[in-house]
Design a protein with these regions (language model features):
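Conserved NTP-binding catalytic cores of kinases and kinase-like/nucleotidyltransferase enzymes
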Residues: 1-50, 56
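Second-shell loop/turn segments in exported
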Residues: 36-42, 128-133, 160-161, 234-235
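A conserved hydrophobic secondary-structure block that centers on an alpha-helix together
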Residues: 37-76, 151-156
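Gly/Thr-rich phosphate-binding loop signature of adenosyl cofactor/nucleotide-binding cores
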Residues: 83
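ATP-dependent phospho-/nucleotidyl transfer catalytic cores
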Residues: 88-179, 255
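Middle-to-C-terminal accessory/interaction subdomains
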Residues: 150-154, 159-168, 178-180, 200-205, ...
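Conserved protein kinase catalytic/activation segment
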Residues: 189-204
Length: 336
């Protein structure tokens, strides 16, 4: 006797909408919104789940996930990853009071003045964002912030960023995106909210299927694909200031010492894979990636080792003599 509840269902996803196995957004009568992702391009099916777990561990509030088996009109549709939506309920459950919420829906959400495709000035500096919640001035405030990033200089720029950006959260989020290799996550696929008390912007992860050594189509990619600074106009302006470069470098090192290690990730990834292994074998839509599934834990751990070595080498090259991080850290940790 399962529970029966009314719900509204719609397709979700970008290129995956064309796949035979669809992904869905579920809105229950209670107001709970869930995403059921087919994860068709990820042979492990755990990259989103592992990324959100990792982000949570390093201090970035992230969606909760769980695997589910879906049947449609009595017909088995296979295994899905259920992902909590980033919405009012998400913030309420975490005690975060917020003023507005936007989704970075495409790569125009890059904190730049020009459109990434046409290279012409954007019609609105808020292009690329999907308005979710807020007031009539939400997009105006965002446009003013982005405009200030490119108009202000030196101490005035630094003051404006400090006033409007939660730098601690930003550095954690940036480090997480960089270490997991989420190439698409710097200019889109994130949630941007304004904290109600401070008025500062916070940034949260949204879609991390392309990570841990594979791109968003599931193809292997090099561990040095994503540079340690990430990619967007906000980060570029933040890193004009040496003290903020140092803070970010120290955050990267802290995470590589504590959370981004084979010893920490291995048991989590292994547990996730073991939990879904029997269901993956029963899902006909996953037949093409079944062979790869068995090697995904080793693949992910190999990526972590390579990524750690690359990031540490790049930190030395990027910072030079500007900062003096501990010699042991810059030389590489024991798990490398």
């Amino acid at each position: 006797g399962g529970r029966i509840s009314g719900a509204r269902i719609r397709y979700r996803g970008g290129h995956t909408r064309e796949y035979a196995k669809k992904s869905y957004e579920i809105q229950l009568e209670s107001g709970l919104v869930l995403h059921w992702n087919a994860e068709s391009d990820d042979p492990s099916m755990i990259r989103n789940a592992l990324s959100f777990h990792f982000m949570e561990q390093i201090g970035v509030p992230s969606p909760r996930t769980r695997p589910v088996w879906l049947s449609v009109s009595g017909r088995p549709d296979g295994i899905y990853l259920e992902i909590e939506a980033v919405n009012s309920r998400f913030f309420s459950m975490r005690g975060i009071r917020y003023r507005s919420l936007l989704y970075a829906a495409n790569d125009s959400a890059n904190f730049e003045l020009k459109d990434p495709e046409s290279r012409r000035r954007k019609r609105s500096l808020a292009d690329g964002y999907e308005f979710i919640e807020g007031d009539g001035d939400t997009l105006v405030r965002l446009s003013d912030f982005i405009g200030g990033l490119h108009r202000l200089k030196d101490s005035r720029l630094q003051e404006a960023i400090e006033e409007r950006l939660d730098l601690d959260l930003y550095f954690k989020w940036l480090a997480g995106a960089v270490l997991t290799g989420n190439y698409d996550g710097f200019e889109q696929n994130y949630a941007l909210y304004e904290d109600d008390a401070s008025g500062r912007y916070g940034i949260l992860p949204w879609d991390y299927e392309g990570s841990w050594g594979r791109n968003c189509f599931g193809k292997p990619c090099s561990a040095d694909l994503v540079r340690i600074q990430g990619y967007n106009g906000l980060t570029r302006r933040v890193f004009q200031f040496p003290e903020w470069r140092r803070r970010y470098a120290e955050e990267l090192e802290r995470i590589m010492e504590t959370e981004f290690t084979e010893e920490r990730i291995g048991p989590v990834a292994g547990g996730m894979l073991e939990r879904i292994a029997s269901a993956v074998k029963l899902d006909p839509a996953r037949a093409a990636t079944l062979k790869a599934f068995g090697g995904e834990k080793a693949f992910i751990l190999a990526y972590i080792g390579k990524r750690r070595r690359f990031v540490r080498a790049e930190l030395k090259r990027w910072l030079g003599n500007e900062v003096s991080l501990p010699r042991r850290q810059l030389a590489g940790g024991s798990s490398d």
